[in-house]
Curated annotation (Swiss-Prot):
<dbReference type="InterPro" id="IPR009000">
    <property type="entry name" value="Transl_B-barrel_sf"/>
</dbReference>
<dbReference type="InterPro" id="IPR019927">
    <property type="entry name" value="Ribosomal_uL3_bac/org-type"/>
</dbReference>
<keyword id="KW-0687">Ribonucleoprotein</keyword>
<feature type="compositionally biased region" description="Polar residues">
    <location>
        <begin position="135"/>
        <end position="150"/>
    </location>
</feature>
<dbReference type="InterPro" id="IPR000597">
    <property type="entry name" value="Ribosomal_uL3"/>
</dbReference>
<dbReference type="GO" id="GO:0019843">
    <property type="term" value="F:rRNA binding"/>
</dbReference>
<feature type="compositionally biased region" description="Low complexity">
    <location>
        <begin position="220"/>
        <end position="237"/>
    </location>
</feature>
<feature type="modified residue" description="N5-methylglutamine">
    <location>
        <position position="151"/>
    </location>
</feature>
<feature type="region of interest" description="Disordered">
    <location>
        <begin position="133"/>
        <end position="155"/>
    </location>
</feature>
<dbReference type="GO" id="GO:0006412">
    <property type="term" value="P:translation"/>
</dbReference>
<keyword id="KW-0694">RNA-binding</keyword>
<protein>
    <recommendedName>
        <fullName>Large ribosomal subunit protein uL3</fullName>
    </recommendedName>
</protein>
<dbReference type="InterPro" id="IPR019926">
    <property type="entry name" value="Ribosomal_uL3_CS"/>
</dbReference>
<dbReference type="Pfam" id="PF00297">
    <property type="entry name" value="Ribosomal_L3"/>
</dbReference>
<keyword id="KW-0488">Methylation</keyword>
<comment type="subunit">
    <text>Part of the 50S ribosomal subunit. Forms a cluster with proteins L14 and L19.</text>
</comment>
<dbReference type="GO" id="GO:0003735">
    <property type="term" value="F:structural constituent of ribosome"/>
</dbReference>
Length: 237
């Protein structure tokens, strides 16, 4: 199990494939994605890596977090997240993960906080059909109707679909296809929409319901590894 990455949602656009078909994509940007800390079985009881992305002002960073980043020899980060990994995919502290961590055609799971819609009625929140527009209807056009039953059971069951706060929840969209990556600019283009507003931090992981492509880098797509491969290619030429 490899580590995921933290990316920032820039927005949506479209690209064209080899067949000339237009594909809607969401652009995710990775900015200075470094390994900040490790979690090991001996010390923590499980194996994981803590990643940090972005840049935070030193004056806005607490003294404890300054020491945490200094220990890893990385600049203060705007966002931290932890990813469980297998022991053979544990990464060293301080290394940078690039967009080449994913390959075109790979399936990924994307996690983000959905856009908040405020207090919404059942027609918007749960796609209810509503009531009649006329013919005896009295100000219940968009109402949900009955909520309970009779004396037995004499209550409203938990989970009843009703009006309430919509959005602003943690959402994971599974099996999204990676269309392409741009390591130089740190961009990942995925097919379709992902949860979250523009500028939101998104967690991208290998899909749990799809196999990992054979050409996916292990333990991760690292910045130093990319440079080494480029140097080796130039030397061979």
């Amino acid at each position: 199990m490899r580590s995921g990455v933290i990316a920032q949602k820039l927005g949506m656009t479209r690209v064209y494939n080899d067949a000339g078909e237009h594909v809607p994509v969401t652009v995710l940007r990775m900015e200075n994605c470094h390994v900040v800390a490790q979690r090991t079985v001996e010390k923590n009881g499980y194996t994981a890596v803590q990643l940090g992305v972005g840049v935070a002002k030193v004056k806005n960073t607490s003294k404890a977090m300054r020491g945490h980043f200094a220990k890893a020899e990385v600049e203060p980060k705007a966002k931290l997240a932890e990813f469980r990994v297998s022991p053979d995919n544990l990464l060293e502290v301080g290394v940078e993960i690039t967009a080449e961590h994913f390959v075109a055609g790979q399936k990924v799971d994307v996690t983000g906080t959905s856009i908040g819609k405020g207090f919404a009625g059942v027609m918007k929140r749960h796609n209810f059909g509503g009531h009649r527009a006329s013919h005896g209807n009295s100000i219940t056009h968009r109402s949900h109707g009955s909520t309970g039953q009779r004396q037995d059971p004499g209550k409203v069951f938990k989970g009843k679909k009703m009006a309430g706060h919509m959005g602003q929840t943690r959402v994971t969209t599974q099996n999204i296809e990676v269309v392409s990556t741009d390591s130089d600019r740190g961009l990942i283009l995925v097919r379709g929409a992902v949860p979250g507003s523009k500028g939101a931090w998104i967690l991208v992981r290998d899909a749990v319901k799809a196999s990992l492509p054979e050409n996916a880098p292990k333990p991760a797509g690292l910045r130093a590894g990319a440079k080494a491969e480029a140097a080796a290619t130039e030397g061979a030429e």
